Structure formats: C-alpha cells, structure tokens
Amino acid sequence: MVDKTHFDVVICGGGLAGLTLARHLRLELPELSIAVIDRLKRPLPEAAFKVGESSIELGTYYLGQVLQLDPYFRKYHLPKLGLRFFMGKSQGPIEERPETGQSIFPLVPSYQIDRGRLENDLRDVVQKMDVELFEGTVVESITLAQADENHTIGCLQKDEQRNFTLTARWVVDALGRRRFLQSQLGLKRDSGHYASSAWWRYKGKVNVNDVAAPESHAWRNSSIEDRYYSTNHLMDTGYWVWLIPLGSGATSVGIVTDETIHPQNTYGQSFSQAMGWLQQHEPALWNFLKDKEPMDFLSFKNYSYASAQVFSHRRWSCVGESGFFLDPLYSTGSDFIATTNTVTVEMIRRDRAGQLTEADVQTFNKLVIDIIFQTCRGFYRNAYRSFGHAQIFTPKLSWDTAIHWAYTYQVYVQGFLTHPTEEMLALGERYRDLNESVQQLFIDWAEKAPPRDIYVRGDMTRMRFLQLLHLELAVRRDSQQVLDVARKNLDHFDALAQVLFWQAVEECYPENEMLKKRPWINTWRMVLDPEKWAESGMFDAETTPRPLDEMRDNFTGIFAPQNLRDRLVYNLSFNIMHWQKGFVHYNVVPALHHKLIFRKPAMWVRNLFITDHQPQ
C-alpha cells in the first residue's frame, strides 16, 4: 500500500544522478516533498556494480562541497592521484613506455569511488532526509502534463507485481541509459563519437607498479606516491585500458576502443575473449592478470550518445546519462551529473517563485548542450587515433585539461551555470570553436607524423599555465573578474594553439618554407595541410601577435630535449615541490593556498605564472 502518491518532485531512477539530485534538492529547497523510484532494492553489491568509478575536480566539488559529503568521501573512498597515461610502445615493458602522470596528490582533490558502496550509503542518507524511496519499483510510464497540471508516473512494484501511480509537479528522468523521456519525446541524437567498452573487477589490489619487471626499482621510485592511486591508462592507437582502485579493496579493469579500429566483437563477447585481446595488444598487463579470476564481466557497444534537449519549462528534466553520455576518458561523467542536477535545482527554485521562463530554459539548454557538451565532445571524437603518439597525446591532455578547468569548471563554481550572461555564452562559443580547431589539428597530426617518445616523464605540475589554472580552481571572483580572466585565458589558448600548429607543421612538413617565418595565424581557421592554407583564411589573423615563449615553455622536454636553462628553471621548482617526499607541497603550499587564494579573488596570482596581455 502506497501511503503518499503526490510529490513536488518525482525522480525516476535512484542511481548516482538521481540520489545526488534528491540530496541537492533537500539541502537547497528543504520544503519540497521528494520521491525517488528505482528498480533495484538494497543491499546493492559493492565493487561489482557499476562503472563510473572515478571523479575529477568539478564532480568532486559537487559531491564534496555542494552536497557536503567531503568527510564521507575522505573516510570511505580512495584519494585519486590524478590521471596517468602510458602511451604507445604497448608490446614492451611498461616501465619503458612514455608516461604522463603526477607524483604527488593534487591540491584540489578527487576520488576513486566504489559505486555500490556509494549508492548504498546515499540511499541511507536521503532516506534520513525524509526523501521517499520506492525501491524494487519499475517506472512503466511517464505522462507529461499539459499547462499547469501534474505529471503522472505509472509504477510497478516488482515483488508484489502491484501497479500504482504517482503524481508530481516536477518529474526528472534519472533512469540512465534507458533514456525514458528522450525516447518518448524523440530527443535522442547521435554524438558522432563511436566507441565501445568491456570491463570487469578483481578482488584485491591490482597495482600497475607490479606489471613492471621486479628489478625496476628506479622506475617505481620515480613517483613519490604509489601509482596505484591514479586512474591508470595503458594506451595505443585506437584504444585505452583502465586500472582503477576501489575503496572496497577491489580493482576495476576496462578496455575502451574506437569502434572503427578495434570493434567490440573482438574483445567484448566474453572475459576469455577480452583476455585474448589483452594478450595481443597489452601483453605485459595480460601476463600479470592471466591467472586472476574476475568478479564480473560486462560490455557495451557504441556507448556514446547526445541529446537535442535535456531541460524543459514544462517542468521536466533529464539528468546524468538519461540525457547524454560522451566517454569514460577523463572521468567527466560526474561533471555532467553536477551540471544537469544543478540546473534542475535552479529551474525548480525559479518555478516555485513564479519566475521560470521558457527563455531561461532555452539558455540552460544552449549552455549545457551547445557549449559545454560540444566542447567536451571535441576531446573524444576521432581522437583515439592519436593515443599511440606520446608527443601528440601529451600536449592534447594538457590542452583538454586546461580548457575544462578554464571554462567549464569556472562557469560552474562561479555561478554562471545558473545565471549565464550573453557575454559568457559568447566566450563559451569561442572556446568551443577554438577547441574544435585544435582537436582537428591533433587528429591530422597523428595521421601524418610517426609516433615518438617524449624526453621527460610528463607531469602537468611542470606546466606553468596548468599550475595557474589549477590554483584558480579555488578562487572566487565577481562576475566582471571572471569574465576578464576568461577573456585573458582565451588569449593564452590562442597563443598555445599557435605553438601547437607550428610544432605539427615541423613534424609533418619539415621542409615547408613557412617554418622559417612562422607567421601569426587565425587558429580558429587553421588546417595542417599546406595545400589548404590559402583557401582556409588562416593567415587572416583576428588577434594581435605576441611572444610565444611562455606557452612554448609549457612543453619543455615534450617537443625537444631539455636544454640547460630548462633543467635549471623548470626542474628547480619541480624538485623543490617534490623535496622530501613532497614536504613543501603537502605542508607549506596548502597553508599559503588557504590564506592567500582559497575563496578569494587572488587576481595577483596570475602575475606569478603568466603575462596577461590586453585581450582582443
């Protein structure tokens, strides 16, 4: 018997997106009546449950700060030592592969998450907050209301095979890949990114360090913190393999491929087939795993998809994977949960105040789908072909991270997601379009140039522009300051793209005469093929030329061996931060950061890392 059948908000789906939305609503709008419906009953299995086990900075900010769960994550889940990549040379020892990854835990935290543990705990949390949970219940229908009437949700309680109906002013689709409303309303779209995956879990610790030869002591000791705590990626042309530690003590392993290069039917039909694929493509990892028994095995073909609309002024929304999904690379899934949940809360807030307009919702859809989603889509579409090129993927990783921190993260934490302005939207379109141009450059570069090693172990803490953007994750500025910095950073991304373009030309067309001049170009129109330069309009620059030394220095040891100056200037600060197992980083920097930067405008900090020019 269902005691209560009408709610202010009914959330269809009790996974990570639905449960976090329920908590978010209860914290922000405590007067609401909220129900969550999910087909699964507790207890949910730990470890062998769902993927999406790794977070990055924006998702962590949402989970830890907005939802006030930071103490919980610190206690029950694992700290994340950033993203680590072993690129190319997949037939050899892992310790001899080009590597990019951090040696010390970053100042702004992120976590390795056991999804079963988290979702069990979140159900307990929201239930204690007086959220009504309908567990073991299937959503069979959603009838959207006309005008100001209530929505109707048809449900089936599985154990009793009993049908019942709920009504709500707001209905939220958090049913994940079932994409109930997207299917019903004809809103599904192709993402243009065709990739597939298979994954499984092992009991116990699978440490990437142990994949190396036993005598590789110097390589093991080259990272202050244990590589085990990173999201480890073993990559080559068309694929990557993940190793993720879980707080329950298990380890998640997955294969992810470009479907056009490594079809899912070559590895995704069974665990034994997946291991055979690893034996062929990642023999060192296969040799380490070959005698271990998996806890589970799952596979998904063409997992990526897009949407025409996820928010409606008619009082519905699609959050998390019920709207769109791009790729597990970079762990952006929780970022999109954060953005779609936060917009949903804002729409409900405005609706209760009688202030929600159709124009508001159109703007939210534009920001989330046309700008943030499409910018992130550029990171992945056709990009897997560069994964065996260490000299290309390392700057790509830096670029992708910088774009995400400089625009998407700042839009969220500085309040522009819920209160977007025309100027911030216009800047977002410029960031998106420049990103598309640079991503195409990476693709064309990888098709033309052979893979080669980088000259140092890549570590983004060596790159001053990324150091600055990482510090600025913690600042809080007024609207005008945020816009000013976004314009200045776009100026730097333009300069960074100039450096990347001429490096690509140097590697792909070393005899080209323009290398002697290296003129300033329009990076929004650049094309790598010299035969297309004249028609592209890329020599009609829209921005003012300026020195490129600062941007070029971000790639010291990547494009060419380090010279004496590089070793003195850039390695010195790196070595100071890593002295005595990171003593300065862990003890001195956090105190200064909290006193001088945390939740402050800290405009002065930019002068320590970069020279800002007047944006065009």
Descriptions of predicted regions:
Residues 17, 21, 42:
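Conserved Rossmann-like nucleotide-cofactor binding loop
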Residues 237-239, 245-247, 259-383:
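FAD/FMN-dependent oxidoreductases across multiple families
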Residues 26-51:
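Glycine-rich FAD pyrophosphate-binding loop
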Residues 45-92:
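N-terminal FAD cofactor-binding segment of flavoenzymes
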Residues 3-17, 35:
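Beta1/beta-strand and adjacent pyrophosphate-binding region of the FAD-binding site
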Residues 347-615:
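C-terminal helical "tail/cap" subdomain of flavin- and related membrane-associated enzymes
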Residues 104-124, 263-269:
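Short beta-strand to alpha-helix junction loop
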